[in-house]
């Protein structure tokens, strides 16, 4: 008997958005191959699938595969396994990723390279591996998970945001390249979504957590704001899974799928008003929230402290100039 269920490969399926989407799609008659990084994640995916009755040979199917997106050998082995078992890959959903929080000066190049290996190059390599199969069948769908951070830059996430800007651009390029062979590409752009993984480990840069860092005060304020936004956010991983299902089943999927009214509003504003105006709006909403709280030791707001530091630097430069004169 021919198995005509759509075959989807989902990376990062051991937790968070990837786990939720794997279970959601399997429950809607997709044959899901979910990649996981660790034994614990593999166990979590298998147990949750079994609990929901999503057996490998039943109506819904979830198969866990160990894969590190930074290793080409893992990628090739995974793709070969799916082609051998299922005969094709109808869709790929890229969820595997990591965070990196901290001001640029506090990020080590090792931390940044590791981030790009997973969040950017991992997407590129896996896409390269599946495209020949999709191209040969003249059919396929690719979903790249970006972020609100790929549309708007913000302090304290310069490394992460720059990587997300990169994959948004990648998605737009692939959209045109894939169309030549009926491979449809979409970019999923959620805002802040609380998941257990995000709540436990935001992957803060080592130097960013050092109280001697010149950015430490602002970094802590920004993290506090993120906590508040997460607490107020109503979107869940299951909501994102629903959007993924919509992308994979739409007759003509769009390029961009932004999740959240506020995100859509901010991106629309950025696109239609002069950037200088948008920058002022963004400064009032975000930058001043970070800069204005009073420092417990000095009594100054972060903004005042920053102005004070700049004033000191200017005074020092003037003094040095007079000495040289």
Segments and roles (model prediction):
Residues 147:
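Residue(s) in the substrate-gating loop at a strand-loop-helix junction
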Residues 127, 163-166:
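Active-site helix of classical SDR
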Residues 14-16:
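Conserved glycine-rich cofactor-binding loop
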């Amino acid at each position: 008997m021919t198995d005509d269920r759509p075959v989807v490969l989902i990376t990062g399926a051991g937790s968070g958005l990837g786990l939720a989407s794997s279970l959601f799609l399997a429950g809607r008659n997709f044959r899901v191959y979910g990649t996981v990084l660790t034994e614990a994640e593999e166990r979590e995916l298998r147990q949750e699938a079994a609990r929901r009755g999503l057996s490998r040979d039943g109506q819904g199917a979830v198969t866990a595969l160990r894969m590190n997106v930074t290793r080409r050998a893992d990628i090739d082995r995974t793709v070969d396994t799916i082609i051998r078992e299922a005969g094709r890959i109808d869709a790929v959903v890229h969820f595997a990723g990591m965070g990196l929080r901290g001001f640029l000066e506090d990020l080590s190049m090792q931390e940044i390279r590791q981030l790009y290996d997973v969040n950017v190059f991992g997407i590129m390599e896996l896409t390269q591996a599946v495209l020949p199969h999709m191209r040969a069948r003249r059919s396929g769908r690719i979903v790249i998970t970006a972020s609100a951070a790929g549309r708007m830059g913000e302090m304290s996430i310069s490394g992460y945001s720059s990587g997300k800007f990169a994959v948004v651009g990648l998605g737009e390029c692939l959209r045109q390249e894939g169309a030549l062979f009926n491979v449809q590409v979409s970019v999923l752009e959620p805002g802040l979504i609380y998941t257990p993984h995000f709540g436990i480990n935001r992957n803060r840069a080592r130097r960013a957590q050092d109280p001697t860092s010149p950015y430490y005060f602002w970094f802590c304020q920004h993290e506090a704001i993120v906590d508040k936004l997460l607490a107020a956010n109503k979107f869940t991983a299951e909501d994102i899974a629903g959007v993924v299902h919509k992308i994979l089943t739409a007759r003509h999927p769009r390029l961009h799928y932004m999740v959240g009214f506020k995100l859509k509003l901010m991106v629309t504003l950025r696109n239609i008003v002069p950037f200088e105006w948008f920058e002022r709006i963004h400064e009032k909403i975000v930058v001043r929230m970070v800069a204005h709280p009073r420092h417990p030791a000095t009594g100054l707001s972060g903004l005042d402290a920053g102005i004070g530091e700049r004033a000191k630097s200017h005074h020092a430069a003037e003094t040095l100039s007079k000495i040289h004169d």
